[in-house]
Regions:
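Membrane helical hairpin/interfacial module
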Residues: 42, 49-100
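Short, charged low-complexity intrinsically disordered segments located at boundaries
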Residues: 57, 73-75, 97-101, 188-192, ...
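Short juxtamembrane and helix-loop transition motifs at transmembrane-helix boundaries
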Residues: 2-7, 61-66, 81-93, 108-120, ...
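Juxtamembrane/transmembrane-helix interface segments of polytopic membrane transporters
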Residues: 62, 66-69, 387, 391-399
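Hydrophobic alpha-helical bundle architecture
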Residues: 115-119, 308-388, 392
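Mid-membrane cores of alpha-helical transmembrane segments in multi-pass membrane proteins
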Residues: 75-81, 99-107, 126-134, 155-159, ...
Length: 463
């Protein structure tokens, strides 16, 4: 009992991004033998940055929830809204212990994978690690895993996933940030990589979302906070009018005039984005130099993989464009699902904001405005159809009518669920261990090849 309580305490710490990244910063600064004052300042500023970011996200989500409610009421559509938090909260009642163990040892496995393979990425988005650990734990348990085998296999799968997806996104992160210092850690990566790839195909000659040639009297629109406020104001007002005065005032505004409420919520949305951007800037100023010390000691040349808002400051206009076009993709996907007589996946405003905004930034980096729009639209379609394919897997293990919202959960869930149908627990463990061994072998061969080339180069120089 004491061990389980201790483990839950540790997991409660690790799944809070601010504390997790603060600990990494602390270890890194101590490893660099920084002065006590620098260690305290760097650690607290890193934690502060994440708390500011989290506060901005809370403000933003609080303004988006009424928008989703207005949409559902206005168009009277019934279906499933994918939600990570909802399905995890249900699963934890039965699978809490296995989730905690897989998360704790999965983070250790991530460091081991980064240390001994070429996937040099440390995934620092604690809550997404927690959600993925939960999904892996549930699927493996139902597949017949238990005890040490469950924790070992689940942790190794989680560690590999935590290193693989940041590696997949890194080529686009270099385009976005202009450096190779930070990586991307959010389990919607396939949608963002798809957006970046589409941008590279269709965005030739398209100007960046951040390049706006406006008349002098409209120059104020270059301020992203103003342009976001005005754009969202139009959307909120349309939704409020469509939902009706009585519904909005009774359900959301507490009697406040529904149009005034819509305008305030639109500006609150912009305030949430502004706070997130400030938090990200604070984090980046502290975590990159601090992580250098951490990686030098434990995992040479590793990069910190951070949550999706880390890319927002690089293209604030793409954030809004990405959200709008991802949501549009969700609406088109909803229509197509209806025509195909499949389960209706309603476009959740919150997942479409965070994943759509990120897809917009990735698409803009490779294809400008056109890339941001088409790439984010494709992301919207992806996160509409993947949950439909994941539903049978989750339904078979007792989670009907609920599903995960982000792309990587869908792909990993579908893959694991189908492996569990056709392979024994022993075979799945063997497959995962073989994959890890293959990655280690590739790393060793690459190092040997590099060492041989250096020896030959030095020999040639001496001659």
């Amino acid at each position: 009992m004491f061990i389980l309580e201790t483990l839950n305490f540790v997991v409660d710490i690790l799944k809070v991004p601010s504390v997790l990244v603060g600990l990494i910063a602390l270890i890194g600064l101590v490893a660099q033998k920084k002065a006590f004052s620098d260690v305290v300042k760097g650690t607290i500023k890193t934690i502060l940055g994440f708390i500011v970011l989290g506060g901005g996200a809370t403000v933003l989500v609080g303004s988006l929830n009424p928008l989703g409610g207005m949409f559902e009421h206005a168009f009277n559509i019934q279906g499933i809204i994918p939600n990570n938090e909802a399905i995890v909260s249900i699963a934890l009642e039965k699978y809490g212990a296995s989730t905690a163990l897989i998360m704790a040892f999965g983070m250790v496995a991530n460091i081991v994978v980064a240390r001994f393979t070429r996937l040099k990425y440390i995934f620092l988005t604690g809550h997404h690690t927690f959600y993925m650990a939960c999904m892996i734990g549930v699927i493996l348990t139902v597949a017949g895993f238990e005890g040490v085998g469950l924790v070992f296999t689940g942790s190794l799968i989680l560690g590999l996933v935590m290193a693989f997806f940041p590696a997949l996104a890194q080529r686009y992160m270099r385009r976005i940030t202009g450096t190779d210092d930070i990586a991307f850690g959010h389990f919607g990566t396939l949608g963002y990589v798809l957006s970046g790839w589409i941008g590279s195909l269709c965005g030739k000659g398209s100007r960046s979302t951040e390049e706006m040639n406006l008349p002098k009297n409209l120059s104020f629109l270059r301020d992203s906070s103003i342009s976001i406020s005005l754009t969202m104001m139009i959307i909120y007002l349309i939704m409020a009018v469509s939902a009706g005065r009585e519904y909005v005032e009774a359900t959301f505004s507490g009697g406040q005039n529904y149009l005034v409420y819509a305008i305030i919520m639109a500006i609150t949305f912009a305030a949430g984005v502004f706070i997130i951007l400030q938090g990200v800037r604070l984090i980046l100023a502290e975590i990159v130099p601090a992580f250098t010390g951490f990686s030098e000691k434990l995992v040479p040349n590793a990069r910190p993989a951070l949550d999706c808002p880390v890319v927002y400051p690089y293209a604030p206009n793409a954030v809004l464009i990405g959200f709008l076009f991802s949501f549009l993709g969700g609406l088109v996907g909803l229509f197509l699902l209806g025509q195909m007589k499949l389960v209706l996946i309603l476009p959740g405003v919150v997942p479409h904001f965070f994943t759509g905004a990120t897809a917009g930034v990735f698409g803009n980096a490779t294809g400008g405005r056109r890339g941001a729009m088409i790439g984010a639209f494709a992301n919207g379609l992806l996160i509409t159809f993947l949950p439909v394919l994941l539903l049978p897997v989750l339904g078979a293990i007792g989670f009907a009518n609920t599903t995960f919202s982000d792309a990587d959960f869908g792909v990993i869930g579908i893959l694991l669920g189908n492996l569990a149908r056709y392979l024994s627990p022993m075979a799945i463990t063997g497959l995962v261990v073989a994959l890890f061994a293959l990655l280690v072998a590739c790393n060793v061969l690459a190092k040997n090849k590099k060492a041989t080339a250096e020896v030959q180069e030095n020999s040639g120089a001496k001659e």
